[in-house]
């Protein structure tokens, strides 16, 4: 063996070591910093099990937590910028599993928040990542996936066929929505079943209860009154856990017009029209269909997320190329830091979900509530909330790109299958909400027991997806 041949493996190792060790050392340093700082901040903390209890951190303890979060974020950013390719997402992959994982995370948030029992999971799902909920992510990502799929599809088919496919899917979802609304109502008629969790909605701000199935008892009359059939067909009644489905059906119905605009390269016109409709509803609330979903998800407002997601999916390749440039990387770093800042803002929310919850008190309660009402309300999609959604999606996508292999091993096995069947999960979770509400002990205030209940629902849902239970009936 020649000297040069013998030196090659050594040279490879010498070149390889700094590329691999730097991010590892940064990660270990960040983890140690975060653990130490959080321990210092939470020293002497024990969970409060009183109703509405929890822990609020003031002064130094609160800033220590912020410092730990900042250190961890900066370490992840630096590691992502200087790390090797061995753990990054393989750009040659045909299907973008990063989107599947994020969609899986979003639908898990939706499931846990709709099955509203106080558990440890809620410490992560109730705006812990910023003033964002799973619903916004669900709508935006649905648009992104549709944009990606139909840009490819239109390379091998015409607009007429694409329109037919979109309307066929909208029709299938509409029929599914009708069946779920009726099936839930019939299930509540079974002896011993308490259906209030799906037939009423309690406004937590004032304690007022609203009926979600007005006049539905007349459905059993003969003949059935016309106004009852009208309300059912227009999706003016049904479980609140399911009402966003009506929004999605309407968005799919108008999607051919949106796709046609993108195909003609009228993206700027499309976005301007979308913002104009958003502005109209911000100035004066307009209910076009008087459907149930238009109260929590006003159509003219929430279309903005779907349209921008659609455009991002359509121009995905161009956006990714831009993100790889120096300016693009700088923009991603700013997005990550901005998302962290909004998460810290959200941690100042004075409302505690259960006795294990921890909040910061860096902002006076009145100041936080004023800012939240002005910029971050969910139904009206305040400008701050829209910014938070955009920054969080960019940040999570960048994180998954830089650390794909370890995150895929840790979370992907569970979240990716759910993300590939989000509509299926969304349908079945409504029935799980009814079941959980009728299990003795759940929802009674025992956080650990409720955590087990949430875990059981997630596990059963995952198994149903893996076993493809009723996949031929329920859309995915």
Residue ranges and their predicted role:
Residues 3, 7-476:
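Alpha-helical transmembrane segments and their immediate juxtamembrane cytosolic regions
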